Amino acid sequence: MTFKESDGKLVCTFAGHFDTVRSQELEATLRQRLTAPQPVVFEMQDVTYVCSAFLRVCIFVAKTAGPGQFTLSGLTPPIKRVFMMAGLTGLFGCD
């Protein structure tokens, strides 16, 4: 996991599996970093698995970032399917 500020956005780049433990670590980190609404991008092209705890983190970020300010970028078809099945693609941008 890497985090950087770019053009006023928090860009988070991820790789590998996001199981419950890793998702909880991510949530703790983001709760410290996101103290006010700001655009957030999750770069997901190298993510191979997400569990429901990761989906919960995404919902938290979408609410904290503000309306239309959270984007998932680089979703592979299997990962995008998880978000579609959970009905979350309308809550935030998915490309």
Task: Locate the predicted segments by residue.
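Amphipathic alpha-helical interaction surfaces in cytosolic regulatory modules
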Residues: T20-F92
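Short beta->alpha connector loops at strand-helix junctions that form conserved
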Residues: D95
